Amino acid sequence: MTNSNLRTENHFDYVKISIASPQRIMDWGQRTLPNGQVVGEVTKPETINYRTLKPEMDGLFCEKIFGPSKDWECHCGKYKRVRHRGIVCERCGVEVTESRVRRHRMGYIKLAAPVSHVWYLKGIPSYVAILLDIPLRDVEQIVYFNCYVVLDVGDHKDLKYKQLLTEDEWLEIEDEIYAEDSTIENEPFVGIGAEALKQLLEDLDLNQIAEELREEITNSKGQKRAKLIKRIRVIDNFIATNAKPEWMVLDAIPVIPPDLRPMVQLDGGRFATSDLNDLYRRVINRNNRLARLQEILAPEIIVRNEKRMLQEAVDALIDNGRRGRTVVGANNRALKSLSDIIEGKQGRFRQNLLGKRVDYSGRSVIVVGPKLKMHQCGLPKEMAIELFQPFVIHRLIRQNIVNNIKAAKKLIQKADDEVMQVLQEVIEGHPILLNRAPTLHRLGIQAFEPKLVGGRAIQLHPLVCPAFNADFDGDQMAVHVPLALEAQTEARMLMLASNNILSPATGEPIVTPSQDMVLGSYYLTALQPNFKKPNFGDNQRTYASLEDVIFAFEDKRVGLHEWVWLRFNGEVDDDEESKTPQETKELEDGSKLEIWNFRRDRFDSQNNLISRFILTTVGRVVMNHTIIDSVSKT
């Protein structure tokens, strides 16, 4: 940690998530004010006073615990303005500071009875069950007050350590222990609820168990061995992180900062509040009721029922619906617990931390762009003008079209031809990155040269779809603009779609035609047996070049699958042809005509080729012309 220019910067090597000890949970929420007063414990379920609309003291929005709700102003209003910074009001006990501290200052609730953490109890796998080597069903029976568990067998011969007993079984054993003729001196000790679970976890000697398990593994096979390995893996993790198993049972629960679970006043005077406040309120109410019952020495059955209800309230706060009935609010909607806020696609990690929106990026639906080159993509004008706006503004000012940024922005909003011309110049040679989620391999994000198109959809060449695993049934893709010259160079040299033809995983081509392209190629080159082949010399069906055939097709003088004779002096590759011509004719001028199945070759007396006519279809001519045209351009 270094201190420079009065700013403290933290340099981390890594972030680690581990179980928090009860003391650490208290430390998160407990603070000593400048006047020496210790605050942090939330003891009241109230949120705000309905008359004054100010937070209640020691409640879920308490200003003494979490900080003032207005900048530099205490609860009672005695101290206002920044000049009183750091002073603790002697009347209300609120520290005069910025209100933004309410975004990170935490509190805690001291529980009247230990409570099991639902993640470790009901998670898959259940770490509590694995550590104790007790089936999960039995652990739940203990935690939710259905069965007793033997913590100490004493002198009783029929009992075993960690054995489960029902209410009736324990009453029978009690009668046996306290009978007049009883010989039991050391009484067995049983427990129930999370307290018993905590006792069992405290009794574990992890190092000794690890040694015993390692010896047992050497002589075990099959399913038993797999179970032992699973258990030793959990134990080793506890040892490596210096975490104690009993920390899976909570003595205190943290209360997250109030600005992360806000309460907002609506127009009609009503309040909208975060679900967490309702869940915290349930916990505090039940905790306070349990503490009161313990104080007045209420019957055990009532106290036990209250402890079970406290356990269920904490379960709902941490992970609502994981066990038992889901807690619902108004309109029978399930309340969002801490787990719901963290997990899933809309959770804190994926939505806010990993999936942040970045500048110079956009998103739209993709449609097929068959007329594009492989390294090109169609970028909607509306999107391009927004993404490249700083570049366009710079060029407009440099070309003296406008004098300042404000005028440039006004001109851009009109989107006239002048702006579009400048935009065209800007995007010329400036690659953009296209990304399709999920990005499972490096070809999930590739660079393309943008081409301005109308509409609001991004056009994508069909050949690059396999790399993105994209199709055109409503898929969306993200656009990013590389800004630095180095980033643009890297995008052009390494990430351009035409440079990523082979799969990095297998080395095989990933750019392969499929679906429409294969079907189209087949239809174009298919031979129709029903069409009559013209005789050689038929002037209606004889053409001097590929272009002449295409012109005739465009004029609708010939159909796509009709046979034609075409003069073509290039090499012809035909698997169906035999090695020798069907017939050879000597012509009057001394030349020679070779008659093949699908071609007629004419040679002079020195055996030089004079002309070659091939019998083919219009579709095959179109296909060959397209290939020759594209190859000659590259």
From Swiss-Prot:
Keywords: DNA-directed RNA polymerase, Magnesium, Metal-binding, Nucleotidyltransferase, Transcription, Transferase, Zinc
One family name in Pfam for this protein: RNA_pol_Rpb1_3
Binding sites annotated in the UniProt record for Mg(2+): D471, D473, D475
Residues involved in Zn(2+) binding: C74, C76, C89, C92
Cofactor: record remark: Binds 1 Mg(2+) ion per subunit. Binds 1 Zn(2+) ion per subunit.
Gene3D superfamilies recorded: 1.10.40.90, 2.40.40.20, RNA polymerase II, clamp domain, RNA polymerase Rpb1, domain 3
EC number(s) given by UniProt: 2.7.7.6
A molecular function GO annotation: DNA-directed RNA polymerase activity
Reaction catalyzed: RNA(n) + a ribonucleoside 5'-triphosphate = RNA(n+1) + diphosphate
SUPFAM superfamilies assigned: beta and beta-prime subunits of DNA dependent RNA-polymerase (SSF64484)
GO BP field: DNA-templated transcription
Family matches, as InterPro entries: DNA-dir_RpoC1_gamma, DNA-dir_RpoC_beta_prime, RNA_pol_asu, RNA_pol_N, RNA_pol_Rpb1_1, RNA_pol_Rpb1_3, RNA_pol_Rpb1_3_sf, RNA_pol_Rpb1_clamp_domain
Cellular component aspect of the GO annotation: DNA-directed RNA polymerase complex
Protein purpose: DNA-dependent RNA polymerase catalyzes the transcription of DNA into RNA using the four ribonucleoside triphosphates as substrates.
Subunit structure: In cyanobacteria the RNAP catalytic core is composed of 2 alpha, 1 beta, 1 beta', 1 gamma and 1 omega subunit. When a sigma factor is associated with the core the holoenzyme is formed, which can initiate transcription.
Family affiliation: Belongs to the RNA polymerase beta' chain family. RpoC1 subfamily.
Protein name in UniProt: DNA-directed RNA polymerase subunit gamma
Organism: Prochlorococcus marinus (strain MIT 9515)
Classification of source organism: Bacteria, Bacillati, Cyanobacteriota, Cyanophyceae, Synechococcales
